[in-house]
Amino acid sequence: MAKIIYDNETTFDALKDKTIAIMGYGSQGHAHARNLHESGLNVIVGLRKSSSSWAKAENDGLKVMTVAEAAKAADVIMILLPDENQASVYYSEIAPNLEAGNALAFAHGFNIHYNQIVPPKDVDVFMAAPKGPGHIVRRTYTEGIGVPALIAVYQDATGNAREIALSYVKGIGATRAGVYETTFREETETDLFGEQVDLCGGLSSLIKTAFETLVEAGYQPEMAYFETCHEVKLIVDLIYEGGLERMWHSVSNTAEYGGMTVGPRIINDESREAMREALKRIQNGEFAKEFVLEGMVNHPVLKAMERQEKEHQLEVVGKQIRANIPWLNREIDDD
């Protein structure tokens, strides 16, 4: 079982006299920077000179520098850039400014685990990964609570990497909800698996296939959308709040019996084998290699799939339905 650390077990001592550079000011970046700053820690933000976020970060009361300047000024450097951009920025702007005893931090282990970034041996390397999007990390912090987070130490050059990681997650509010210790390998492989197999890939494919099945059978697309997509949130919220048991307890007996008897026929042994194959490709690095190569040529496959998704009938119908629901929260975190 994972070890869980709470607020009363941690202090800010390991970061008290250090400067923390947050590289990036997107969804996670703005939340980390503002939470750490409001926790009384010394925070700077590293951005490109041309970044539209420069003025935003300054307006939020933060000191902003270029990435290279921030790396040179900082003791702890948290890289909160897209996975595919991290290595190039690291080698061109961060690595030349690293000093022995500095700490490199990540919110996801992809680049370290798959050796896209190979840090020098004389710096600490740790992970601080909140299990929620940036706007939730920020909102819950301001409410006096927080979201759970993961920590991991990949390299402990100073002998103090774990304490720095714990002070960091305390600063973003995560210890209020509980912090779980893991490894870079475990976080990376389980995170990618979840994204691909159920949270993003599996769920979206299940929704689209169910929608297409109803429409092909002659049902109105609007009815198909409500039953296969719109109501997903109702079910997911129940699971999020109380697990599968809460969900089964809350739905009708008809839904419970039908779901329990038919569900295993849909997600069956063939599906399980496909999941094992997806996990194998994550573990052996095949997926990482494919993704890195795709990024090197500016993501042509991803862009084509995004266009196809946007044109899918489910998306067209869904957009029309959502436009007619005035109370629906349509806030999108573009970052």
UniProtKB/Swiss-Prot annotation:
Binding site for substrate: S252
Manner of cofactor binding, per the entry note: Binds 2 magnesium ions per subunit.
UniProt pathway annotation: Amino-acid biosynthesis; L-isoleucine biosynthesis; L-isoleucine from 2-oxobutanoate: step 2/4; Amino-acid biosynthesis; L-valine biosynthesis; L-valine from pyruvate: step 2/4
Residues annotated as the enzyme's active site: H108
Binding site for Mg(2+) 2: D191, E227, E231
PROSITE patterns per record: KARI_C, KARI_N
Cofactors that this protein relies on: Mg(2+)
Start and end residues of each KARI N-terminal Rossmann domain: 2-182
Sorted UniProt keywords: Amino-acid biosynthesis, Branched-chain amino acid biosynthesis, Magnesium, Metal-binding, NADP, Oxidoreductase
Family: Belongs to the ketol-acid reductoisomerase family.
Protein known as: Ketol-acid reductoisomerase (NADP(+))
Taxonomic lineage from the root: Archaea, Methanobacteriati, Methanobacteriota, Stenosarchaea group, Methanomicrobia
Gene expressing this chain: ilvC
